Amino acid sequence: MGGFTSIWHWVIVLLVIVLLFGAKKIPELAKGLGSGIKNFKKAVKDDEEEAKNEPKTLDAQATQTKAHESSEIKSKQES
């Protein structure tokens, strides 16, 4: 009842996997899973690098937008 803590639970799970997929298919599945994880980690790393570079451009855009909005407000107040 405590979950998958017993070695026998894992043996049964392994046997079911072998019966479902066959012994020849398991290495292919493991290889596909490994390459999927590798691609996922690479994508996360690339996104983190882009995020480090991105705030510089966003800050500049925010400053320009605030300056534009404040000039519009002043022109409306003068009218």
Swiss-Prot record:
The way this protein sits in the membrane is described as:
Single-pass membrane protein
What parts of the sequence cross the membrane? 1-21
Task: Return one GO MF term.
Answer: protein transmembrane transporter activity
Q: Which NCBIfam families match?
A: tatAE
Task: Name its cellular compartments.
Answer: Cell inner membrane
Q: What does this protein do?
A: Part of the twin-arginine translocation (Tat) system that transports large folded proteins containing a characteristic twin-arginine motif in their signal peptide across membranes. TatA could form the protein-conducting channel of the Tat system.
Q: Which GO terms describe its biological process?
A: protein transport by the Tat complex
| Listed name of the protein | Sec-independent protein translocase protein TatA
Kindly state which keywords UniProt assigns to this record, in alphabetical order: Cell inner membrane, Cell membrane, Membrane, Protein transport, Translocation, Transmembrane, Transmembrane helix, Transport
Which superkingdom, per the lineage?
A: Bacteria
Which residue stretches belong to region Disordered?
Answer: 48-79
One GO CC term on file:
TAT protein transport complex
Q: Which family does it belong to?
A: Belongs to the TatA/E family.
* Basic and acidic residues bias locations: 66-79
The record ties this protein, via InterPro entries, to: TatA/B/E, TatA/E
**Subunit organization:** The Tat system comprises two distinct complexes: a TatABC complex, containing multiple copies of TatA, TatB and TatC subunits, and a separate TatA complex, containing only TatA subunits. Substrates initially bind to the TatABC complex, which probably triggers association of the separate TatA complex to form the active translocon.
Q: What is its main location?
A: membrane
